[in-house]
Amino acid sequence: MRVAVTGGCGFIGSHVVDKLRDQQIDVRVLDNQGAPHRDDVDHVRADIMDQGVLNEATRGIDVVYHLAAVADVNNVAADPTGSVALNVLGTANVLEAARTNQLRRVILASTVWVYGAAREERVDEGVCFDPALTGHVYTTTKIASEMLCHDYKTMYGVPFTVLRYGIPYGPRMRPSLVIPIFMRKAIGGEPMTVAGDGSQNRKFVYVEDLADAHVLALAPEAENQTYNIDGSEEVTILRIAETVHRLLGGKGIEFVPARTGDYGGKQVSSMKAAREIGWTPKVNFDAGMERTVAWFLETQGQTALNPA
């Protein structure tokens, strides 16, 4: 089998590549933002906004994992039109390339942020969304991307799988994510800032557990299905700050006003993924944080005070 991974040089994408190679699957990384972290994969500097390049880059591929997107909600808020273009049109371009080259599957990276548009507090893959509740352009781009997958299946017969990620953490995290920010502040002697009262909860999912789901999603049972890939423990932002403080010390916590449109968290069930493709998270939050802090100190400890 030959697969392509858009965004394969990124935080999650690089771990997906690792898990695929562990299974001896041939991988082509499609990414114009950097180079792969390993040399046993093909690399094409493909821009997902360039349909011709994308068509050529996916020729001879069986399955494409589509992870390339504007994933930082702050960047989406700062540039909504550019984010809509990349996240929505980019997904359409990937689906069109799959149609052109008759790929066996498109596996889409989505997010539990889509449940911000659900009225229910306890949610699974079958809940309906209310457009009036999306609350953030990022949420809307992900719902639109999922809808395009369904449309391309209905209209053109392109099979898909949607993976709705919980909040990922672990080695290779982007510097702009909350855990690396907290770690830099802790070792820099600055207080960690927490939005609101810190009670916002997510089931943070360790990145290697998340990456495992991408291999399991190749199963025939996953075709044309959507799965929540979320952690097993409810973790508040305040607990993250307290954990970083415990592991790294620092000046403690400072509370600031909440962000507009922030996803407040839902009770997300991942039982469908456990039942149908055998996925469950294995790394608990404390163990994952210990690994993440160890990676951070090993790779960025000398430069953490002045990140690029």
Located regions from the model:
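N-terminal Rossmann NAD(P)H-binding glycine-rich loop of SDR-like oxidoreductase domains
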Residues: 3-23
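SDR active-site strand-loop-helix element
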Residues: 6, 30, 64-67, 106-112, ...
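Conserved glycine-rich Rossmann-like NAD(P)H-binding loop of the short-chain dehydrogenase/reductase
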Residues: 25-34
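Rossmann-fold cofactor-recognition segment
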Residues: 40-50
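NAD(P)H-binding glycine-rich loop region in Rossmannoid oxidoreductase-like domains
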Residues: 48-86, 97
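A conserved pocket-lining segment of Rossmann-fold NAD(P)-dependent short-chain dehydrogenase/reductase
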Residues: 75-76, 128-135, 158-171, 182-205, ...
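Catalytic helix-loop patch of NAD(P)-dependent Rossmann-fold dehydrogenases
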Residues: 78-93, 100, 105, 114-162, ...
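C-terminal substrate-binding subdomain of Rossmann-fold SDR/epimerase-dehydratase oxidoreductases
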Residues: 186-308
